[in-house]
Amino acid sequence: MSERKYFGTDGIRGKVGDTPITPEFVLKLGWAAGKVLARHGSRKIIIGKDTRISGYMLESALEAGLAAAGLSASFTGPMPTPAVAYLTRTFRAEAGIVISASHNPFYDNGIKFFSIDGAKLPDDVEEAIEAEMEKPLTCVESSELGKASRIIDAAGRYIEFCKGTFPSELSLKGLKIVVDCANGATYHIAPSVLRELGATVIAIGVEPDGMNINEKCGATDVRQLQERVLQEKAHVGLAFDGDGDRVMMVDHLGNKVDGDQILYIIAREGLRQGQLRGGAVGTLMSNMGLELALKQLGIPFARAKVGDRYVLEKLQELGWRIGAENSGHVILLDKTTTGDGIVAGLQVLTAIVRNSMSLHDLCSGMKLLPQILVNVRFAGEHNPLESEEVRKITEQVEVELAGRGRVLLRKSGTEPLIRVMVEGEDEQQVTALAHRIADAVKSAG
């Protein structure tokens, strides 16, 4: 694979107003994508977005570029990323485009593409789009220009799809659920799904103003959800990120339940129901406690590189069906083609109802080892991970852990961050060791 100039691990992302997230660049991107995608036959593209204020500007730019290449755009309005993947499949569109920066602050935005089957675009198609970007923009004949339309019932279609992943013989009646939609794309979807399945729903993070997406709420900050679950004496809480492809949960005692624990619950339930094909895929960041708990159940476990696209690749390579990142991306290939927070949450709720067990009890078979993650921001072109001092300190830490823990350093694929993760048996030791490495990374950056 050649080095890509614009596409990262999750599409194209950046600060609004800075290249590449400018109207000029996105218009050219729409045109280049249109030129490449038009070669495959269909001339319809689905465009969805989250609730960021910049989404209006960027969808207009995308639509203009696509139209110039002869492709028509169908807009969904604010819609979760997995909903756009689903609608792309059901409308047999040539591609789906999501305008979102996922869990990032409102002043960031991004563009990611789905192929006709609802999966991420293959690398060679992304590379072809980048190659087209280098050419001068030309417009098709006036009679061949693309048009724009709006999908009126997009939300209703996706709500019905989500409900269809919950067993028809079960109901959420009797469950009180707090749901935090991060003032993002699930704000008008998730509460309706849960209510229509019978739950009593308290919804927070459902008042987007274009600038409050992910702000002290949602899957990246569950403190507000934890407080509300305890205050309302709710059975469970669910938190989604800004574009709805991640989910975190909170049990009735206010404890956070992360992607590793969610994967454990879904894998165990699949085993109990005789529906588990193969094993489960996690990532290099997945807690060792997940691996040990699955081993006890006889469920094979494999680690992929960090990033939901790599989890998906590993699932396809092994022929398995379920995988997750501890950040809450959960991929269930029997139901979806990409990470879907609402669908993943519904599978955990299925286990709660079917087994008449609390979320807390469902997690009890898995003991999380202390895992400390420190994010170190760096400036400039130099990668701190190439520093001799960082390498030396990391080796010292590994010696101190003496085979009873793990160290992982990696560069973020979406932000100028080095993620330092240390895992072991003793939380105090793990914390000190993580910060020792982080200090070395800071000095090197």
Swiss-Prot record:
GO biological process, one term: UDP-N-acetylglucosamine biosynthetic process
Pfam families the UniProt entry points to: PGM_PMM_I, PGM_PMM_II, PGM_PMM_III, PGM_PMM_IV
Active site per UniProt: S102 (phosphoserine intermediate)
Binding site for Mg(2+): S102, D241, D243, D245
GO cellular component: cytosol
Cofactor note: Binds 1 Mg(2+) ion per subunit.
Keyword Metal-binding annotated: yes
Entry-annotated residues carrying Phosphoserine: S102
GO MF annotation: an example: phosphomannomutase activity
EC annotation from Swiss-Prot or TrEMBL: 5.4.2.10
Post-translational modification: Activated by phosphorylation.
Listed InterPro entries: A-D-PHexomutase_a/b/a-I, A-D-PHexomutase_a/b/a-I/II/III, A-D-PHexomutase_a/b/a-II, A-D-PHexomutase_a/b/a-III, A-D-PHexomutase_C, A-D-PHexomutase_C_sf, A-D-PHexomutase_CS, Alpha-D-phosphohexomutase_SF
Needed cofactors: Mg(2+)
Role played: Catalyzes the conversion of glucosamine-6-phosphate to glucosamine-1-phosphate.
Name used for this protein in its record: Phosphoglucosamine mutase
Source organism of this protein record: Serratia proteamaculans (strain 568)
Lineage, uppermost ranks: Bacteria, Pseudomonadati, Pseudomonadota, Gammaproteobacteria, Enterobacterales
